[in-house]
Amino acid sequence: MSERPSRRGLFPAWLVSAFSLSANGQDWTALREQMVRLQIERRGVRNAAVLRAMREVERHLFVPESLRRSAYEDHPLPIGHGQTISQPYIVAAMTEMLDPKPADRVLEIGTGSGYQAAVLAKLVRHVYTIEVVEPLGRQAQALLERLGFRNVTVRIGDGYEGWPEEAPFDKIMLTAAPPEVPQKLIDQLKPGGRLVAPVGTGWQELVVIDKDLNGRIRRRTEFPVMFVPMVPGKR
């Protein structure tokens, strides 16, 4: 579900125009509230901080203008390059599973539109996020900067390698599905940390991996999901 469909010149036209919607701001606020109540709380997400972040982050700014009216609907949306922004419930559920804390440093694999990073940034000290598709990564970086998210750092690169120079991380989230969780990412998880990821090919399972203080790994499966594959390299 987490497919990943300006400074002028850096921002595409749909993104620039998004910031002229203040006249409809109350409408967007009402739509976010409805999204949280009907799609997220009703499905069992209870973490108050996560719900607050979902209410605060302006999801419609992370989608193309032609799809903005659908931004708060209960499904993923294309954002270009064969990628999508995840369904709101999946964003909230994975964030709650991650159990983010205010002092956490979080690694995200799969920046996409930047929406998941923005939600995490409301909850933790710093988000390090890696995107393999360079145009998407640059676009997300510019938008996050424009929106004032100073605690998000974007890198264009191979998510399979992680971010070793900033490791270890308190939490790691994958928003694309590898066949199996890369050992390099498990190695970059701090003892006492948690990793949440879709795993498998085709239909996948959402997996939670906990590393205890002695470095032992415990793994549990939550529910079936469908994400884009996690591809190596840089595109």
Which residues does each PLM region occupy?
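N-terminal secretory signal peptides and thylakoid transit peptides that target proteins
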Residues: 2-14
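Conserved nucleotide-cofactor-binding alpha/beta core module
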Residues: 99-218
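Short amphipathic alpha-helical segments with coiled-coil-like heptad repeat character
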Residues: 1-3, 62-64, 193-194
